[in-house]
């Protein structure tokens, strides 16, 4: 059975530390991502590569993330969330420094390997962090996932501000990235040490991690745990049934589009501003900081809106806001207008991942399998997005390539409207802000 659930008399103090721990780790991942994103113009120039080639390099990050996500369920079921998060964040922190070192040696393959390792660490940790967040929501009956992803965005703001400063003084990326890694290492260690041991582990003979029940269900006398003599041979079929569930398909379309919107800004926004507006690297970092700040604001305030209006309704409105933001940045006549438009892009994209995951996880019907499934949909966008936009940008311009993002967001708004009808009387919302 799943182990590691805190006892009732310990729950308040343990949950506070546990919550702080996963927030700290998510913050560290945000700083890592922004540290890379804000220095992409400088890294591109040092490597001497084109937009299409940058897209291929970024595919390393996405491919690593996808491998991490796809392998996370089995790894979590064997080792537990704490160990997976510890390994994942350690790999990502070390790989950030490697990216800077390989940039100095003008090694594009080395940078691609570093990005793949960053993505791998983020991918395996992200699923584990979301499972931790969903479990804390289950225990406290309070919304947490928007705030959890909000701390990622807070990390991107801090990382982006540092990127602005270091870009302004023309600090070489290697020094910037290695300094960030040295600072984030102790913070991440403190974070994962607050996560209880053993949570997420499935004993031999239980349902595989991706098809496991919540801890409460697994502990129940009539829970899904099976004996060693009767292994669950239907687990693959159950996983396929989750992936083909109409509700999961709708959520998958939404998180795919929202992931595309978020990932395209993370990967291409500084370069878009530098190339399309003829702006400096510092200006590109400043616009990206505006995006990151609006993402953080949307996620930190989003729980109240989800509580009031419901998951699917918030997703629909968010998609529409993101459409206007993306189009505004594409057709902005100057950097100031792009900065204003990017705020809509950021707020609109901010709740896509956390609210979609929360929608999938707030169910008694195999929530871990559902969270894993929709997370895979989201990371598919990060896998396909960078090289696709890079290839399109090389031929039709990066701004025109981003019209694909706007089109996907329109599709997400339609899917969220359909999802609203399906969930109106089915999904209980967490209590409290």
Please describe what each predicted stretch is.
Residues 174-193, 402-418:
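Symmetry-related core transmembrane helices of the 12-TM Major Facilitator Superfamily/SLC fold
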Residues 82-85, 315-316:
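Primarily marks hydrophobic transmembrane alpha-helices of the MFS/SLC 12-helix fold
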Residues 90-105, 321-333:
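C-terminal ends and interior cores of transmembrane alpha-helices
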Residues 123-139, 350-365:
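Intracellular juxtamembrane helix-capping segments at the cytosolic ends
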Residues 38-52, 267-283:
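Short amphipathic helix-loop junctions that connect adjacent transmembrane helices
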Residues 68-81, 167, 298-311, 393-394:
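Helix-to-loop junctions at the C-terminal end of transmembrane segments
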Residues 27, 106-125, 337-350:
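Hydrophobic core of transmembrane alpha-helices in multi-pass small-molecule transporters
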Residues 309-356:
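C-terminal transmembrane helical hairpin of 12-TM major facilitator-type secondary transporters
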């Amino acid at each position: 059975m799943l182990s590691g659930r805190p006892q009732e008399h310990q729950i308040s103090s343990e949950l506070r530390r546990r919550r702080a721990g996963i927030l700290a780790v998510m913050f560290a991942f945000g700083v890592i991502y922004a540290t890379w994103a804000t220095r992409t113009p400088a890294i591109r120039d040092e490597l001497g590569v084109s937009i299409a080639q940058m897209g291929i390099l970024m595919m390393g990050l996405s491919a690593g993330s996808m491998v991490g996500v796809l392998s996370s369920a089995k790894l979590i079921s064997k080792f537990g969330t704490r160990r997976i998060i510890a390994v994942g964040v350690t790999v990502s922190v070390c790989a950030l420094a490697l990216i800077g070192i390989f940039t100095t040696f003008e090694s594009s393959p080395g940078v691609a390997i570093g990005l793949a390792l960053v993505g791998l660490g983020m991918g395996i940790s992200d699923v584990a962090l979301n499972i931790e967040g969903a479990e804390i929501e289950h225990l406290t009956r309070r919304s947490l996932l928007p705030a959890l992803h909000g701390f990622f965005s807070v990390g991107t703001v801090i990382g982006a501000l540092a990127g602005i400063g270091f870009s302004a003084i023309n600090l070489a990326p290697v020094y910037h990235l290695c300094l960030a890694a040295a600072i984030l290492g102790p913070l991440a260690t403190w974070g994962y040490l607050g996560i209880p041991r053993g949570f997420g582990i499935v004993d031999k003979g239980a349902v595989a991690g991706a098809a496991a029940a919540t801890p409460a269900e697994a502990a129940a006398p009539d829970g899904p745990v099976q004996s060693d003599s009767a292994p669950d041979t239907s687990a693959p079929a159950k996983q396929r049934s989750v992936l083909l569930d109409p509700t999961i398909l709708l959520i998958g379309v939404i998180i795919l589009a929202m992931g595309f919107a978020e990932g395209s800004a993370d990967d291409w926004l500084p370069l878009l501003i530098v190339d399309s507006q003829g702006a400096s690297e510092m200006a590109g970092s400043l616009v990206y900081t505006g995006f990151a700040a609006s993402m953080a604001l949307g996620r930190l305030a989003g729980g109240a809106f989800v509580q009031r209006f419901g998951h699917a309704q918030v997703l629909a409105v968010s998609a529409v806001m993101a459409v206007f933001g993306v189009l505004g940045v594409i057709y902005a006549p100057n950097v100031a207008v792009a900065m204003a438009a990017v705020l809509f892009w950021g707020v609109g994209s901010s709740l896509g991942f956390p609210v979609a995951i929360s929608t999938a996880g707030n169910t008694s019907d195999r929530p871990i399998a559902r969270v894993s499934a929709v997370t895979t949909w989201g990371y598919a966008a990060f896998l396909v997005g960078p090289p696709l936009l890079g290839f399109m940008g090389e031929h039709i311009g990066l701004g025109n390539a981003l019209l694909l993002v706007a089109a996907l967001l329109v599709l997400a708004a339609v899917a969220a409207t359909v999802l609203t009808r399906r969930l109106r009387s089915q999904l209980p919302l967490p209590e409290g802000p």
